[in-house]
Design a protein with these regions (language model features):
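Conserved helicase ATPase core of P-loop NTP-dependent helicases/translocases
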Residues: 117-121, 126-174
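Short, high-confidence coil segments that cap the C-terminus of an alpha-helix
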Residues: 22, 115-116, 160-161, 179
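Switch/connector loops and helix/strand junctions flanking conserved nucleotide-binding motifs
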Residues: 34-38, 173-176, 190-191
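Post-DEXD/H (motif II) to motif III coupling segment of the RecA-like Helicase ATP-binding lobe
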Residues: 5-71
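Conserved interdomain hinge at the start of the Helicase C-terminal
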Residues: 79-133
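A short beta-strand element within the Helicase C-terminal
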Residues: 165, 172-187
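Conserved Walker B
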Residues: 1, 5-7, 169-170, 186-188
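Conserved SF2 helicase motif VI
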Residues: 31-32, 181, 188-191
Length: 191
C-alpha cells in the first residue's frame, strides 16, 4: 500500500485504511507536521521512517523550484493590538492572520508584483473570500468544483490569470511551476 500525503493518515476519515492487510507499506509526504501534534501516530499506523531527503537536496537536483523566503512583518494598529491582547490564547493566531492591516499589506504586495504569477495562500476561508473580492481575483477552495479548479489552474499556468487566491486544497498534488510569488497569509500554525 502506498499512502500519498501520509501525514493525513491519523485523521478519522483516513485512519481506517491502516487496517487494510499488506506486507509492505510506503508513506510519502513533503512534511510530517500536523496541527494536532499526531505526527507520531503515522509511525504506529504504517511503521518507522526509512528515508528522509532534505528539501534543499531535492531543490538542488531540480525536482522542486528554488525558493527565496522573505518574512514581511505587519505592525498592528493600536486597536488591533488591544484586541489581540484581550483575545483568548487559542484565538490569537487566527486574529493576527486576519487583521485589516494584514489585508492591506497583501493588497500592496499583489500590486507590487502585478506582472508576476502570484498565489495568495491561506487557512481561513472567510479571509480568503474577502481577499478574492478585494483583489478581484478567483478563489479556489474546498467547495470549488474540480472542473472549475482545473480551468483556473490552467489559466494561471498560461498567464491568462496573474493572481489566484487558494486555500489548503492547493497544498495537495498541484504543480504550478509558473508561480513566481507565493504570499502565505495564514496557516495552521499562525502566520
Amino acid at each position: 500500500i502506498i499512502y500519498d500525503e501520509v501525514h493525513l493518515l491519523p485523521a478519522p476519515i483516513f485512519r481506517f485504511t491502516a487496517d487494510i492487510q499488506s506486507r509492505r507499506r510506503l508513506g510519502l509526504t513533503a512534511t510530517l507536521v500536523r496541527e494536532d501534534g499526531m505526527e507520531g501516530e503515522v509511525f504506529s499506523l504504517i511503521g518507522p521512517k526509512r528515508f528522509d531527503v532534505p528539501w534543499k537536496e531535492i531543490e538542488s537536483q531540480g525536482y522542486i523550484a528554488p525558493a527565496e523566503c522573505v518574512e514581511v512583518r505587519v505592525n498592528l494598529t493600536e486597536t488591533e493590538r488591544m484586541l489581540y491582547a484581550t483575545a483568548e490564547p487559542e484565538d490569537r493566531y487566527r486574529y493576527c492572520s486576519t487583521t485589516t492591516t494584514k489585508r492591506k499589506v497583501v493588497e500592496a504586495l499583489v500590486e507590487r508584483h502585478v506582472e508576476d504569477q502570484v498565489l495568495v495562500i491561506g487557512q481561513y476561508i472567510s479571509q480568503l473570500d474577502e481577499l478574492s473580492e478585494v483583489l478581484g481575483v478567483p478563489l479556489i477552495k474546498g467547495d470549488t468544483p474540480i472542473k472549475e479548479r482545473e480551468r483556473l489552474f490552467a489559466q494561471f499556468r498560461t498567464g491568462e490569470i496573474k493572481c489566484l487566491v487558494v486555500s489548503k486544497v492547493a497544498n495537495f498534488s498541484i504543480d504550478l511551476p509558473d508561480a513566481t510569488i507565493a504570499i502565505q497569509v495564514s496557516g495552521a500554525f499562525g502566520s
